[in-house]
Amino acid sequence: MTTQTKTSSPIQPSPIEQSPIQQSPIQQSPIQQSPILQSPIQRSPIQQLPIQQSPSISSTSFSNSNNDTNFNSKRLSNSIFPTSTSPVLSPLSPPLQPQPLISTSTSFNINNNNNNNNNNNNNNNNNNNNNNNNNNNNNTPKTTISGATRSSWTKEEERLFVEAYKLYDKDNKKIQEHVKTKTILQVRSHAQKFALKLEKNGIKSLDNIDQLFNQSHAASSSHNLPSHNTPWSNEEHELFLKAIEKYGRGNWKLISTLIKSRNTLQIKNHARIYFDKISQQNGPPSKKTIIEVENNNNYNDQNNNNEQNNNNNNNNNNNNNNNNNNNSFFNGNDNGNNSSYSDNGNGNKSTSSKSDLSNTRSSGSSSSSGSSSSSSSSTISSGGSGGRSSGGSSGRSSGNSKKSSSKSKSKNPTSKPITPIQPKLILPSRNIILSSAFSTPTPTSISTFPKTPTYTTSNYKSSNNPLNRSFGSINNSSSNNNNNNNNNNNNNNNNNNNNNNNNNNNNNNNNNNNNNNNNNNNNNNKPPTKERYLDLNIITQEEMMGCKEYFTGQISKTPDRYIKIRDKIIRQWDSFKPNYLSKTFSRNQIKDCGSDINSIGRVHQFLESIGVINFNAVGNPLNNNDYDRDNNNNNNNKNNNNNNNNNNNNNNNNNNNNNISDLSAILSSAITNRMLENRKTNNPLRKRKIFYDGQWMDQSLLNTTIEHSGNENDKINMATSSTINNVNNSKTSSSSSPTNESSKLYNFEDFSSFPSFDPFTLVECKKYNNPNEQPFTIDVSSNTMIVMDIHSHISSTEVIGMLGGKFNPDTNHITILLAIPCNSISSDIQCDMDPNSQIAAKEMVNSIGLDIVGWYHSHPNFEPIPSLRDIETQTSFQNLFATSSNNNNNNNKSMIEPFIGFIVNPYHKNGLISNFNCITITKQMDETNQYRIPYQLSTSYTPSLNNQYLYQQIDNLFEKYKSYSSRIDLKKTMENGGFTHLDKMISSISSNLILNNNSSSSNNKNNTNESDLINCDEDIIQDDQTELFLTKIKNQFKDFNNNNNNNNNNNNNNNNNNNNNNNNNNKNKNRNEGSRSRSRSRSRSRSRSRSGTRSRSRSRSLDSYSRSRSRSGGNGYVGEKTLPKKHHHQHLHNRHKSNTFNDPDLSDSYMSEVSRSSSDYYNTESSSSMSDIEDDDISEYSDTENYKSFNKNNNNNNHYNNNFLDKPVLQNKPSYQ
């Protein structure tokens, strides 16, 4: 079924009209349409003008004079470049599947102005009479084509439809009589969609239809704003470009304040479509589409078959005579909204707009008068059906329309493959067109760009420039003399350096000369010899080439933005000199010049390379060696590029100095090579670090040391010689002498150099077969063990501290007397000691006559074996404290490292007693020569030497950690038993608590001179004294939890007793404040005194026994169980007596005695250090004979009474087990 279209001149029927089978492929298979029709984007710049602005369109549907067959009603989506065989529909039509053909519809004619005026194409309406007929149609609906056209429903039509729908329900014929502007098919389709909306919104009554109608309008932006289908006008697009330049991309709310006629969603969609077309400039044209380039400025296609000179291909609409011999800036004072009209001699007016990057299209057709045939501009109508040069005229056709393509080839046998012409980019902020000397590849289509103004030689001055900066003209006419004779490129404005391909001097090459020009180029790579001062009112050619990204027409990088960045960096240097101005500091100070910090850094790099900033700056990281490396690299690059480009001209030294492209090559090559060289030499790639638990850590290192999942089988990453050997197979280990191996320090970077070498990998310790093989023997006091145990129990992160004591070089014996907790930066898998805290601990230990003999740290929930990081730290300490020692065998002096390390594991699943491991690092290397092997040491434990200071240390730990964010909630019940963390801590402390007696002191002597200082003749301590000691600690930590206020529970209890009398309330308050303290002293009788301090002290006479035990480093001590059974479980609170614990040492915990101290000490304020102890106190203990006299002389003057050290008499040092 065919229908004859109404045309102005009779046209002979085409073969397609006689044979419906040979219809256009679009008729036969809608799926095989042009790829443009398959684009998912639903809007394009073609939709941005009302239909009424196009003089070549008369109504809302179409007809084609060369094919009277009916086209299916298919929406044209994003047809930016409709081809000759593609049907063009209204861009406002919503998507719809192909509908049946009907007899009533509207139509319009496609008017394609053929570029080849000598060929009269009967397939398209190219006659001017057709244009006049179309102009006289006045958008009157026609009934000549049997194809329904989809168009948007206006508000009035929607209102009429709702009224008719309420009256007639689903009677579409009556509804169509009510809405006379729509066909029965359109009404039926709209009624189906409307019924779905009613069902979706749950509206069953026809009386509630108005509610849906109001919601649909409220969902849109506003009644006063145009719908999404309304094309954007010139003014709206101009405001859009200005807002993008002012606020940047993404700030849609701010942009909507400037474009008041659009809401944020419409602006966002418009920006998406706009930037999508801009992004297409960098990619090749689609393989499925033959892109037809619109020539709004009468750019002549290089494959045009007209046999005319290029000088005749001028723009008849704009009368712009492009000078092909000069490239310079044009005067940018044109108003972008002005439009000019010119009569083309045929009665039709062609419209051209100067607005930057607007979506207007020149409509109508233009033809030259006389016999000379001039190419007319191909036009796109705003309604989406603009005229194109048809297949016969330009040889273009749809990629899928093979028949039409062959038809055009038969009429144009000499047509060549079409290459899209690259237009000039336009800077929307200043209306600047950059010359081809530094233009970048631009879009494959200029249909999204307006007319290009002419070049001028005058300097550009922007009205928006407050400093009236001028851009110097650029002379780059060395290769433009052949443009008029160039058969491939007819217009210099379209070439973008493509015209230079046929010349001997290639401006796009980075290096245009051979090795004879290296001397001139190397001068530019040398460091600046003097400081330069730029005129802030102009932009030099050197700046344009060094920072050319700001002069290529990018929306986000404009000359204005470059000026702001450059001026701010120069001002920063003026206020910062002579100190070095770094990129980081500059970027932090520049906030309103875009978010691309890398581009700001490149501007900084350029200004620094030419001597504008950081000239002779203090702390400048650049040196002459860097420039020498750059020169060598540039020379090598020049040699390679010269061989590839065949640039064998040896007499171009002077030209190179004046060539802007060479200057760009020199600057970009120097900057690029410098950045690459610095990356290779100074900035090796590092693993990404994240901030975890107060510490910057490698992301790959997290959860690698231990995976504590709460199951019985915890996965611990252990390192053995075999596993480390497998890790380092890729790296050849170099053999080194034993001297170098012993003195080698292992840094964190050493471990990171291996692909999978984790510095937190745990390494099993080896054990000595015989205790006599140990490098030294060790005694550890009970107060040292208790401090380390409590310190590790109350923190979920690793803790760290120093160990104070004495080393006897004659016997190679270490006595550890004190543990000093230190501040640290901790996480659950690593811990770094605060240097200031470490220095303070050393000074305090030295002030009382002791030395630093070791350090300790905790592994909260994994085995107490060292990691590679611990081995590194221990090795460094041992090398620091290394000293000479006499060998007992041959009396030869050898180096010994008297520095040991303790690792505490408080929380494990093998019992309640904390695991302690004493280690040293030997000089023996592992199989891979990567680290020294750690060994486990056996230790002996001695009684506490100063219980008063032990109380003070425990109190300081409580005060310090009660507000710590990662503290342990001691009130929380443990997972593997019915007891709390506090019970577990008390149980572990009781195993380390050792007191003295003097029953056998007269018969035994301690082998260590430092501990054998005191003779004791005090009374025997009662058995229940140990219970009092543990009870005091338990009462102190009973409210230690992870709440911000430790006294909340007590305060709540007080609130329940508000009805009591005042005396009872006062008593409760005193208890809650924790102000009650007791000081007990007992010889034959006991007396109590209360003071305002919180601490409680008890002193009793010494017991009649003392015990020293050795530990093998496991789950308890090795020794006989000598305590009576009546003390079984007494170190725990009585209510848990019925609980059964698996720890074998729990029932036989060894209790120490607490030495006597005066109550005067507890009336003084607690101090966190022992700096108030006089230096002479310890020095007086040089021997035991004068101790009694020293004690009698100082008993009345010293408030410590018994001084720092108590008077325990130690037993003989036990044998190692």
Swiss-Prot record:
Keywords: DNA-binding, Hydrolase, Metal-binding, Metalloprotease, Nucleus, Protease, Repeat, Transcription, Transcription regulation, Zinc. It is found in: Nucleus. The keyword Aminoacyl-tRNA synthetase does not apply. Residues 140-152, 455-474 have a biased composition (Polar residues). Disulfide bonds: none annotated. Residues 145-199, 225-279 form the HTH myb-type domain. Zn(2+) binds at residues 857, 859, 870. The keyword Amino-acid biosynthesis does not apply. GO terms for cellular component: nucleus. Residues 778-921 form the MPN domain. Residues 172-195, 252-275 bind DNA. Residues 383-394 have a biased composition (Gly residues). Residues 8-73, 82-91, 99-139, 296-382, 438-454, 475-525, 632-661, 1041-1067, 1155-1171, 1187-1204 have a biased composition (Low complexity). NCBIfam families: myb_SHAQKYF. This is Myb-like protein H. The gene is mybH.
